[in-house]
Amino acid sequence: MKIKVASAVLAVSILFSGWLYWGSDLKVEQVLTSNEWQSTMVTVITDNLPDDTVGPLRRVNVESNVKYLPNGDYIRVANIKLFAQGSTAESTINISEKGRWEVSDNYLLVSPSEFKDISSSQSKDFSEAQLRLITQIFKLDAEQSRRIDVVNEKTLLLTSLNHGSTVLFRN
């Protein structure tokens, strides 16, 4: 009789623990912190904007690597390649970003605290003011809250509340 009661309590405990684990943010946090994640984004600008805003910018390629640490910190390094209209040359901005992260109700909340421009080259196609504006847009995008879905162990889908999705992947 005691063995049956103990077995029943153990079974209920296992079911409850499994439900708690799979239904909580813990699984998402484990997947998020288990690897370094990469993403690639290409933006094409088709609107004719005044040259004084972003200059002759017509395409942006952003490749980034991010590591979410178990202590709630994150580190991201982004390589931003800017392509001007009518030019095959590219201008590159490298940005290192640090901050805090947390998962709440399957939303990834990111709070950047430090940005460093680690670029070494100067741009011929863009003025300093235009590069500052482009960098500021990148910084604003970093502060988004995104819904996080685990597609599989190598792929995460981050869906923004206002504009599109980002896929994080690992090799």
From Swiss-Prot:
Keywords assigned: Cell membrane, Membrane, Transmembrane, Transmembrane helix
Membrane topology: Single-pass membrane protein
Keyword S-adenosyl-L-methionine: no
Gene Ontology cellular component terms for the protein in this record: plasma membrane
Cytoplasmic side: 1-2
All ranges on the Periplasmic side of the membrane: 25-171
One Pfam match: ToxS
Disulfide bonding pattern of the chain: none
Compartment(s) of residence: Cell membrane
Ranges that cross the membrane: 3-24
Record function comment: Interacts with ToxR and stimulates its activity.
Subunit structure: Interacts with the C-terminal periplasmic domain of ToxR, possibly by binding and stabilizing spontaneously forming ToxR dimers.
Protein name, entry field: Transmembrane regulatory protein ToxS
Taxonomic path: Bacteria, Pseudomonadati, Pseudomonadota, Gammaproteobacteria, Vibrionales
Gene that specifies this protein: toxS
